Amino acid sequence: MDKLAHPLARGASWLLIYLTAVQPLHPAIAAGITAANGNTQVAMKPGNVPVVNIATPNAAGISHNTYQDFNVGTPGAVLNNATQGGKTQLGVTIDNGNARLKGKPAELIINEVTSGNRSELKGRLEVFGNKTGVMIANPNGITCDGCGFINTPSVTLTTGKPQFDKQGALDALEVKKGAVIIGGNGLDGAGAEYVDVISRATELNGKINAKTLTLTQGANRVSFKDGTVKPIAGEGAKPQLAVDTKALGGMYAGKIRLVATEAGVGVNLSNVTSTQRDISLTTAGKITLSNVKAQTDLNISGREIVTLAGSSVRAERDLTLAATTVDNRSSTTAHGDMRVFASTVRNTGTVSYTHLRAHETRRHL
């Protein structure tokens, strides 16, 4: 009798095939945080919370840590930037300070993934000790689905590779590929002053909450010296959209800025609200908008601007639209000036403003 003819044998064989097939799909999730070398040490604490003793800061105050895997589960993770022990806000007891600091805490913690695995962030990442900025850099992509940050003034999620000057300071990020995906549980960046997403593309399935939110999209060299964004050659095909907002996605922040540089790559934005200051949206392609509200000014520029029917686009002060074609189908309101710079304007929605300053060559009302 064939050994595989028995039902139990066939079942075991299929189970073995299944496990062999699916295991490679989740290496990053299983791996947690794995340092690439001995400069960074990772220890697991009770409650499945990894504590990372970060690498010795360089002369510029940067602790540059490299990993095979950098994933944060729902219990969270801790970056130890303390010179003394204590208890973290996540409830983890740390007996001793991080000896790698040599008495001098880092001013910026860079966590760079050098393998081929994406990063999955599903919990809160805490800086223990001196408050400092945190960067997670993974060219393969980053998924944030319920991630948050504790004791850090600035958070950067990037698919770029960090570039350093001769003094060891962060010079730029070079982005050639990779997407940041915000899952249904969102990104809570409200505890930081600044949240930056620097990637070739971003997908919003959940909400980003922040004080000051900046998205820089496309294949770019992003300077940390003067803030300039210079397009460079990307790897692989262009994304269909630089930013794509799904049904439950959105951005909520005190101030919002978006720059998308790849020619012909569009942006789909909905549920975008600034609670304190302005919103600035700039793209080299088509930008489609629905339910956008700026507490002060709203500035939008692109090759083509389309506002969707059944939605609202609103500025509590001035609203500026600059494109080759502006196609307004929404309820569009400016409590101050409305400025329109376009070759063609189509309006099948409603428009309300205090003053209109239009500069177009052709208009369809």
Feature map (PLM): residue ranges:
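Bacterial N-terminal signal peptides that target proteins for export
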Residues: 3-12
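Solvent-exposed adhesion/ligand-recognition segments of exported proteins
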Residues: 5, 18-275, 282
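Low-complexity, polar/charged sequence tracts that form flexible coils or short amphipathic helices
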Residues: 148, 187-191, 205-209, 249-252, ...
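Hydrophobic helical h-region of N-terminal Sec-dependent signal peptides
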Residues: 13-17
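Conserved small/polar residues in nucleotide/adenosyl-binding loops
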Residues: 354-361
